Amino acid sequence: MAAPPLGRLVLTHLLVALFGMGSWAAVNGIWVELPVVVKELPEGWSLPSYLSVLVALGNLGLLLVTLWRRLARGKGEQVPIRVVQGLGIVGTGLLASLWNHVAPVAGKPYSVAFLTLAFVLALACCASNVTFLPFLSHLPPPFLRSFFLGQGLSALLPCVLALGQGVGRLECLHVPANRTTGPPIEVSPINFPERFSATTFFWVLTALLGTSAAAFQGLLLLLPSPTSEPTTGTGLRVETPGTEEEEEEEEASPLQEPPGQVAGIVSSPDPKAHQLFSSRSACLLGLLAITNALTNGVLPAVQSFSCLPYGRLAYHLAVVLGSCANPLACFLAMAVLCRSLAGLCGLSLLGMLLGSYLMTLAALSPCPPLVGTSAGVVLVVLSWVLCAGTFSYIKVAISSMLHSGGRPALLAAGVAIQVGSLLGAVAMFPPTSIYRVFRSGKDCVDQCGL
């Protein structure tokens, strides 16, 4: 088969990356904006815990997609993808206008609009794992890396935007007290605003999601339909049942090939690589679930408690740079992919050690070690970045290894991601938001005797 035109190939990779960008851009954008909104919403330091649970409850999107596939067999995968993209665009647009609206619930103020829209966006993002990834099974395996690069952009672009926005500044001013008893002077916190508001941030996020939806439409126009005849020379054929075995040989993933393999010499496929329920695949899926339980449930719920004692800047940098570690891990996986199960387990152990340190800081809040020092700020930010980068690399490596199992393996990977995230978030909600195991500090109040 003739080589595909370079321009068409590059354009397809670009569209796949932009398509992947829309999968988690909404939730990632909300996460990196937490340091800005947490000081204005009534939930305070517990807001990340609420958000973790809402993202976990977004797994209902997985059930809705499953129900759609059973009730609408043969309808294709385009409809759920378009619904997911539509929810993302409308949800972030409403969030830009309503994020700071507060309403009383059981006599207490809650950011009802923010939490409700966050749940809607979580539904869309969770559903994307079982709609976007299976759609890629129709494409040659190299495009999977472009998709994960796009998912990295869904974290990187909101991070760049958040870095430009800044986190604002807090100053503690001594002002005369308005009371007859007690000290005549009291310390009052003064908040200085960011470079642009959270409203502007969410509008830009809406534009990014619109770009992703447009890329998907462009991808559908560029690629042949599953019922059309394969076009010689495009190299971008959509799989059909009659050509599955032939394409499996022609499009073997470079992530699975030995370094010495050259064009025209295709090794026999390993039968074990296509056994979804083999012991190796089960271990990979289990590791993927555990990794996502930590990164999407356990650790995000306590991030504010581990960082805010060191200041808003520490929290801002930990959230933003930690999210930037995701696309960097994708780039690293494109260059060096760990195919060893033992190696991935070793990396998981390293990530768990870093996570244990961060959990310890959260448990000691509001007076963790090195609070009030530059060393403490550097250490907590660096720990978050390394922890996020390590786990992100593991997730990309496992998903790439499972790609050889085809659409069922990628669907199982999406389920493992969501189940792990759900268990992690549900486990952390009671200690953070009900029993108040983790304590929050107060602005301009020294609770550590420094």
UniProtKB/Swiss-Prot annotation:
Residues 227-236 have a biased composition (Low complexity). The gene is Slc52a2. Glycans are attached at residue 178. GO terms for molecular function: 4-hydroxybutyrate receptor activity; riboflavin transmembrane transporter activity. One of its GO terms (biological process) is riboflavin transport. Riboflavin transport is Na(+)-independent but moderately pH-sensitive. Activity is strongly inhibited by riboflavin analogs, such as lumiflavin. Weakly inhibited by flavin adenine dinucleotide (FAD) and flavin mononucleotide (FMN). The chain crosses the membrane at residues 14-34, 47-67, 86-106, 112-132, 147-167, 201-221, 282-302, 317-337, 344-364, 369-389, 409-429. One of its GO terms (cellular component) is plasma membrane. It comes from Mus musculus. It holds the Pfam family SLC52_ribofla_tr. Plasma membrane transporter mediating the uptake by cells of the water soluble vitamin B2/riboflavin that plays a key role in biochemical oxidation-reduction reactions of the carbohydrate, lipid, and amino acid metabolism. May also act as a receptor for 4-hydroxybutyrate. It is a multi-pass membrane protein. Belongs to the riboflavin transporter family. This is Solute carrier family 52, riboflavin transporter, member 2. Residues 227-264 are annotated as: Disordered. It catalyses: riboflavin(in) = riboflavin(out). Residues 242-252 have a biased composition (Acidic residues). It is found in: Cell membrane. Keywords: Cell membrane, Glycoprotein, Membrane, Receptor, Transmembrane, Transmembrane helix, Transport.
